[in-house]
Amino acid sequence: MSDKSFLNWPFFEQRHRDLAAALEAWCVNHLPVDHSDVDAACRGLVAALGAGGWLQHSGGVLDVRSLCLIRETLARHDGLADFAFAMQGLGMGAVSLFGSPQQREWLDKTRAGSAIAAFALTEPLSGSDVAATSTIAERVQGG
């Protein structure tokens, strides 16, 4: 068991301590999983995280401290569980904040773990390096 004394630091509230304890208990009962088929393991983890209510911690209602506690706890028990959680958030984060009504229809499914979010990007000079993307505006005739 890892040292949890940091949860008593003044910037953690009781809700953070409750979250950490509840997730720790969930992890003990559900993790680690068999990684022999990584694709199946990821699908199963997303479904289990959704069924456990852990994917509800997303979008505008999620504070950074809660996000850190969730990711640290999942990663300590099973790195693939942290990956599955992070990818659901990365894939739907922009949709939860800025998505169209049609795009937002996917939020309940991804939070329930019945749909898997995706995040894809390619840029000529950065490939899949999100931090290296850039936007250039060029004035064109007629627009």
Predicted regions and their residues:
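Intrinsic disorder at enzyme termini
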Residues: M1-A21
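Short loop/turn motifs at secondary-structure junctions and domain boundaries
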Residues: S2-D3, V38, S126-D129
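Electropositive phosphate-/nucleotide-binding environments in soluble metabolic enzymes
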Residues: E13, R17, D39, R43, ...
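N-terminal glycine-rich anion-binding loops that anchor highly charged ligand groups
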Residues: R17-L19, W26, L49-G50
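N-terminal capping segment at the start of a domain
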Residues: E24-V33
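Gly/Pro-rich turn-and-neighbor structural signature
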Residues: H35-A51
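Internal helix-loop-helix
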Residues: G50-S114
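Glycine-rich, Trp-frequent "lid" loop and neighboring beta-strands that shape
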Residues: P101-G143
